[in-house]
Amino acid sequence: MALHKIQFNKQEFLAAIAANLARLIFSTIRLRMNDRSGFLTSPPEGPRILVFWHNRIPAISIGFLRHYPRRHPTRKGVSVLTSPSKDGDILAGVMANLGMGSVRGSSSRRGSTAIRELTALLESGVDLAITPDGPRGPKYSLGPGAVFLSQKTGIPIMLLHARYHNAIRLKTWDNFAIPLPFSRVDITIDPYMTIDPEATDLESERLRIETLLREEAEKTDLPA
């Protein structure tokens, strides 16, 4: 009898483990939502560009999406920008396990291709999630992609903040945080922000958004 070789994909395996571990942890979390935008209770027509820091990925990918109005007729799901690296392979796999799509790209690799794909997805009505300081930092430094996309497509930006009351902070470039089981996590959704299509000084818009995200993060960060 012929034996068939079993194919083992390390990235897929790690992604499945990470996604299920995240689900398990968040099944015990006391989650508090502060929706200043009305996104959850009165979902808007058309997509939004969701922007949050890289070290808040667990809270947003599990906590926010627990309340995401996926059955509302205006929502067509969420896709996440992930790095075209081996770490990005794992993150894309985690997102897939959690029911999200992904677009592979970064400022240094596949940047223009990813922008075209992101624009096409936005125009199809999909909400897009971007961690503007990923995948390599600097921590709490907002890249220009979200601002550029918002101006190009006319689609508003929605800032997401997460506060962990008890978490493990990893020794990574961004002090990636993982909430402890049975702890509390607060997620705040800011009102929508639009970028003037005629604006020529996108740097001031970038700094405005970076400041809002950074100040909220530094106010709620736990010691590393």
Where are these regions (language model features)?
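A short, well-structured juxtamembrane/interface segment
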Residues: 23-47, 65-66
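Flexible, charged surface loops at secondary-structure boundaries
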Residues: 41-45, 72-75, 122-123
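Conserved beta-strand termini and adjacent loop/short-helix elements that scaffold enzyme active sites
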Residues: 34-36, 83, 105-108, 190-192
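Non-catalytic C-terminal accessory region of glycerolipid acyltransferases
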Residues: 2-29, 76, 97, 101, ...
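Short amphipathic alpha-helical segments and helix-helix/interface helices
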Residues: 39-40, 69, 92, 146-147
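A generic secondary-structure signal marking the coil-to-beta-strand transition
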Residues: 46-49, 56, 183-185, 191
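Hydrophobic helix-cap positions at the C-terminus of alpha-helices
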Residues: 42-43, 67, 121, 216
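Catalytic core of membrane glycerolipid acyltransferases/transacylases, capturing the structured
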Residues: 47-108
